[in-house]
Amino acid sequence: MIPLSTAVAVPRGFTFTSNLYGFELKQGDQMVATLNRPRVWSSEFIAAMAGQNWIIHRSGFWGNKGEILDTASHQQIAVFKFGWGGKGDLFFADGQKFFVVTRGCWHPVWTVTTELGEPVFQLHTREKSVELHNVAGVSESRLSLLVLFTLFRVRQAEEAAAVAAAAAS
């Protein structure tokens, strides 16, 4: 995998591909990071980027929260609290806070903003691309983790839509 900082220099950011088990984040033909489900029915995902690994999974009694854990120490790095209408807050252990918002029919655009409302990036599910905006105050590792977490939320939305469609038929 190549460092994410090389992807930041690209005007559009980077692209992603999806498969049954997860996503691959790419700059051109080179893989930057991955998000994979270790087993088909597993509720957790493993996020990996150039020597760093995290576990991302749902938590809370109703599954209404999300957690990012360090794979080595299992320490909590961040907590996500779901909100109504596709919104949510992502709180990191160091105090940094981001908002994750989705808009459009069937959630085609996911936007991550800083606590002050400045957009960090937009993830376009139909184009399978990530458009970077204001990444100056976000470390390379944190940016990668934010994109991978957003892809985790995309997969959750896809699975929820599939369940709703199956129940309706």
Language model regions located:
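Intrinsically disordered, low-complexity proline/glycine-rich segments
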Residues: 1-169
